[in-house]
């Protein structure tokens, strides 16, 4: 029986600052059946696209992407923060409220032409996922889709990833 995954998301008012509602996926991850169903829905989306590699940004993109990669029998490549990868990397910058941040991937993480699904827990402004897509494309990969557990529609992150088939299991 399909679960209503919204029942497994904690909403914390005024966190991390006044006026913000933080959507916490920890209860979903803590419940085996809810986590399985969320993963299975993303796996089905990926199967329909012939995905050959999953890429997820640090750190919650790992939580979403790794079980999907396992179920599909494909690899997982992390997009990490500065100083976390030991070999030669490519870099993509993205905007924060005050300044910029960067993500990195190993230069051999994705093969040219490889069909990639980019995963993360949350689509907010689209900055992190946009940088992750940029990294995959720098390496010659083909982003065939993006998948999220939650999308915060008021932040218009989908506008930054127009042209990419996108799945959000829940929208707030």
From Swiss-Prot:
Pfam families: Pribosyltran. One of its GO terms (biological process) is AMP salvage. It is an enzyme of class 2 (transferase). InterPro entries: Ade_phspho_trans, PRibTrfase_dom, PRTase-like, UPRTase/APRTase. One of its GO terms (molecular function) is AMP binding. GO terms for cellular component: cytoplasm. The keyword Cytoplasm applies. Pathway: Purine metabolism; AMP biosynthesis via salvage pathway; AMP from adenine: step 1/1. It is found in: Cytoplasm. It comes from the Bacteria. It catalyses: AMP + diphosphate = 5-phospho-alpha-D-ribose 1-diphosphate + adenine. Keywords: Cytoplasm, Glycosyltransferase, Purine salvage, Transferase. Catalyzes a salvage reaction resulting in the formation of AMP, that is energically less costly than de novo synthesis. Homodimer. PANTHER family: ADENINE PHOSPHORIBOSYLTRANSFERASE. This is Adenine phosphoribosyltransferase.
């Amino acid at each position: 029986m399909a679960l209503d995954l919204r029942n497994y998301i904690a909403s914390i008012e005024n966190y991390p600052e006044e006026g913000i509602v933080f959507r916490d996926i920890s209860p979903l991850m803590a419940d085996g059946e809810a986590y399985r169903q969320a993963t299975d829905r993303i796996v089905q989306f990926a199967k329909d696209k012939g995905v050959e590699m999953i890429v997820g940004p640090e750190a919650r993109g790992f939580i979403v992407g790794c079980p999907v990669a396992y179920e599909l029998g494909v690899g997982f490549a992390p997009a990490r923060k500065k100083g976390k990868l030991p070999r030669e990397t490519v870099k993509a910058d993205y905007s924060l409220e005050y300044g910029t941040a960067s993500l990195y991937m190993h230069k051999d993480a994705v093969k040219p032409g490889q069909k990639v699904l980019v995963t993360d827990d949350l689509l907010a402004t689209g900055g992190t996922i946009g940088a992750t897509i940029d990294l995959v494309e720098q390496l010659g990969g083909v982003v065939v889709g993006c998948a999220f557990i939650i999308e915060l529609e008021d932040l218009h992150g989908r506008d930054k990833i127009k042209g990419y088939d996108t799945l959000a299991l829940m929208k707030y």
